[in-house]
Amino acid sequence: EGHADKKDHPSIFVFDSERKFIRAFGAQFQGGGHGIEVRQEGREEFLYVAAYQQVKCFAKMTLTGEIVWFRKAPMESGVYAPGEDTSTSKTWTRQGFLPTNFAFLDDGGFLLADGYGSFHIHRFDKDVNWVSSFGGDGDGKGKFKTAHGLWVDKRPGRTPSIVVTDRAHNTLQIFNMDGEYQETLEGFGL
């Protein structure tokens, strides 16, 4: 209907348990919203949003849509082109920042997958300070072609680990909690 590029509408919609519409917000993520996670912090729940394409950001929000913090490319990681933290152009390069999803750490920090950009996994502390990165572009152990999603495996009876989906390689790669490569599981057609 001629509105394909319209970006002035919400991207997050809230419904109650009876499927009744409650509210909508998040227009700032329209055209690039990708990953969204809910995290319990004390007595409150928060939304963590990863947005790629021209949006190129990640944010923490209240369940009513108030921004707690909003961040762009972690330039201190050394993996991004100069100016990537202010760019709004769609760049599908390994020096671009195109985040896809989060995984949460017990210390209040989190991991962020740059699944369409540098293919790095970034670790942030509870105050949203960049701590470290692992992964990156490649075909070998510990490298990715589309580090799309991630999860912290804390199942009972197992040593905690970080599991990263690599969609282009159809694999799950497993890392210890310091981001050191452990093993690859193949053949998933992810």
Give the positions of each predicted feature.
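Beta-propeller domains
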Residues: 1-26
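A short loop-to-beta-strand structural motif that recurs across blades of beta-propeller domains
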Residues: 9-13, 56-59, 119-123, 171-173
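A generic tandem-repeat structural signature
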Residues: 31-81
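Short loop/turn segments that connect beta-strands within beta-propeller blades
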Residues: 15-20, 62-66, 125-129, 176-180
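Conserved beta-strand positions in repeat-built beta-propeller and related beta-rich domains
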Residues: 1-6, 49-53, 112-115, 154, ...
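Beta-propeller fold detector
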Residues: 23-26, 68-84, 131-136, 183-187
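Short loop/turn segments that connect beta-strands within the blades of beta-propeller domains
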Residues: 8, 43, 54, 63-64, ...
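Beta-rich, blade/repeat-based domains predominating
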Residues: 8-10, 29-45, 78-109, 139-161, ...
